[in-house]
Amino acid sequence: MRRNTNFSNLEANYLFSGIRQKIQAFRKQHPEASIIDLSIGDTSYPLHTSVIHTFTQSVEKLGNPKTYRGYGPELGLPALREKLSEVFYHGQVSPEEIFISEGAKMDIFRIFSLFGPGKTIAVQDPSYPVYIDTALLTGSRKIIKLPCTKETHFFPEIPQDEAIDIFCICSPNNPTGTVLNREQLKELVDYANAQGSIILFDAAYSAFISDPTLPTSIFDIPGARSCAIEVNSFSKSLGFAGVRLGWNVVPKDLQYNDGLPVIRDWERLLFTTFNGVCLPVQESAIAGVSLFPNLEAISHYRYNSSLLREALQKADFSVYGGEQAPYLWVEVPGHIPDEDVFDFFLHHYHIAITPGKGFGSCGKGYVRFSSLGKTEDIVAACQRLTLTSVYDTMVLSL
């Protein structure tokens, strides 16, 4: 059998697996070094007791012949869909438009698969690598990278001479940690409706938004129901990174150019390819949603982020984002070349970061810091960063 040629279009290594390999190699060479990993956005705050209690009860039911149940509904437990509609969307989205999944990554893949090959995809530059990789794997015809720079306040420059099928937008953004305001999202929604495009809106970090003037969902914007699909996740907010649970919204108003509803095909795809998420996980999520918006984990990560921001600025770095998101986008002085920036932080500070260029060409000259670690690690990293100004450091000969 011939290989799927789409794989030949991918980078040899996924960004974060390459970072892990570099960290492991450094540890072998320097076993005495204490490395603080602020690169990958993994979580550190434990599950809430109410979530654990509900999960345990649900598992015990599966061990009792009287309460055992097998397959659950493919589209998600009705009680969880209703809870999400109430808490996150305040009735703007009906439970029937909410679909429970195992997380945003698989949602993104299924959405691209839903619309099929040959499409033109637009992504923010810099952006989460999964959008481009998934577009390549599913046979997209063209990928347009839209520059998001400090000069544009990290808002994508919308092309006027390109027909876009799927517009990938992440807000709060990974990697820049910045958030699009209502006016910016309205501009994107108006463009999509005028052009017949679909916005794939990644709201995985919406729980970090504390400013009431900022939208937490694309469906806060008038007109979005006819042009957008939203994905979200409990990985960061409830600590479900290893438990796995997310959801997506496909509005009934969203139609193909022939007038057929997209939601019909979406349900058909799920019925064929998916048997639903683990029932105890879904039931524990119902308890978790009741905790919103006052989440201890989010407060923990916000505190970490404030410590990092203060330390980085004290060390004379220019810092963007991190106030409404768990990521800080840090501009690196010109005397540190992009090809050396990961090794610079690893050797000089014993801190692992994510090089900005891994998120796209507009990420050159930047690195991403994650505030999702343990506070004691964040404090130690801040102490190392503030020992000297970055302008007093020298690039090591690596």
Curated annotation (Swiss-Prot):
The keyword Transferase applies. CDD domains: AAT_like. Pyridoxal 5'-phosphate binds at residues 71, 104-105, 128, 174, 205, 233-235, 244, 275. Gene3D superfamilies: Aspartate Aminotransferase, domain 1, Type I PLP-dependent aspartate aminotransferase-like (Major domain). GO terms for molecular function: L,L-diaminopimelate aminotransferase activity; pyridoxal phosphate binding. Pathway: Amino-acid biosynthesis; L-lysine biosynthesis via DAP pathway; LL-2,6-diaminopimelate from (S)-tetrahydrodipicolinate (aminotransferase route): step 1/1. SUPFAM superfamilies: PLP-dependent transferases. Its cofactor is pyridoxal 5'-phosphate. It catalyses: (2S,6S)-2,6-diaminopimelate + 2-oxoglutarate = (S)-2,3,4,5-tetrahydrodipicolinate + L-glutamate + H2O + H(+). Keywords: Aminotransferase, Pyridoxal phosphate, Transferase. The modification N6-(pyridoxal phosphate)lysine is found at residue 236. GO terms for biological process: lysine biosynthetic process via diaminopimelate, diaminopimelate-aminotransferase pathway. This is LL-diaminopimelate aminotransferase.
